[in-house]
Amino acid sequence: AAPSSVNPDRKNFEKNYDAVLKNVSMPTGGVTLQMLRAVKGGNQTQDHLNKITKKTMRDIVYDSVWKPGNISTLPENIQAQFLDMNLVHESKEAVRILQRAINSASEMPSVSVDGILRKGISSAANKTISKDVNLLKAERCLYYAEEIRRKPNQKQFWVQRFTRAISLG
C-alpha cells in the first residue's frame, strides 16, 4: 500500500492553528458551542464542549473556520493572524478588518470594505500587508479601541486582546 500523505492545506492549517494556540490560552481551541452543534448536532451541550478532544477541536476549526474562510488563499505570513481573527470575531468582521488594513497601506483605497473575501483580496493583501504585517495588527488594535468606545464594558478585555493581536505572526 502507498504511504498516506497529509493534505497540504491541512498541514498548513495545523501550523497556523498551532501558532494561534501557542499565543493564547483557549481551553476549547476557539470552538464555540454553536460550531460544535453545527458539526455534531443540536444536542451538544456546554459539558460536551468542555470535554472536547484536541482532534475534534482541530477538525471543527479546520472545517468550520479555515476552509470556509478561504484562509489558505491569503499570504502565508498573515494566515495565523487572520485565523485568530476569525476565531475571535464573526468571519465578516475579520474580513472587514483585513480590508481596512489593505486600504491603509496606500492613499487610495483599493478594496471595498464589505466583509466579503473576494478573489482580489488575496492579491491586494499580497501587494500590501504581506510586506508589513504590522498594518494588519494595527487595524485589529484600532478595531478593539473603537469597540471599547462603543461598549465601555469591553474595556476589561482590552489588554488581553491588544496583546493577542500584536504578539501573533
Where are these regions (language model features)?
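Cell-wall polysaccharide-cleaving catalytic domain and substrate-binding groove, primarily
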Residues: A1-G169
